[in-house]
Amino acid sequence: ILGDILNYGPRNSIPEGIDAKGIVEALNKRANDIIAVRGNCDAEVDQMLLKFPMMGDYTLLVDEDRKLFLTHGHIYNKEKMPQGHVDAIVYGHTHLWELSQQDGTLVCNLGSITFPKGGNVPTFMTYEHGVFTAYTLDGKALKQERI
């Protein structure tokens, strides 16, 4: 989970139908399977409710020989890459999906399921064996890139 887990920030009202307590319960049931990072709208009070760590600015995931840098995107992104080589930087902060190559690194912006911007449809991505695929919510593949 790449941040902004329970709240969309104090400048935005919580949309009707969003059940933060229900989200906490559902996520805590899967706590042992979740890798999460902090978004710009997450706070220590959120961490007090969740049973998995989520306050780190990034995590480095290694899959075989591939390094994936997972972050929210408000600190590290395609304009401010992490130091050292990573095969992919994965984030979502802008809510604008993207799969592109930049100087030997795959840039993966997941977009947003709930709040897509820029006229985009809701999107999500999968990662399997070095391949990222962007999808619409109805399962239509939009683009695929291999690390």
Positions of PLM-derived features:
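Core catalytic region of metal-dependent phosphoesterases/phosphodiesterases
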Residues: 1-63
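Alpha-helical context
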Residues: 3-4, 37-39, 103, 111, ...
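Conserved beta-sheet core of the metallophosphoesterase superfamily
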Residues: 56, 67-69, 74-145
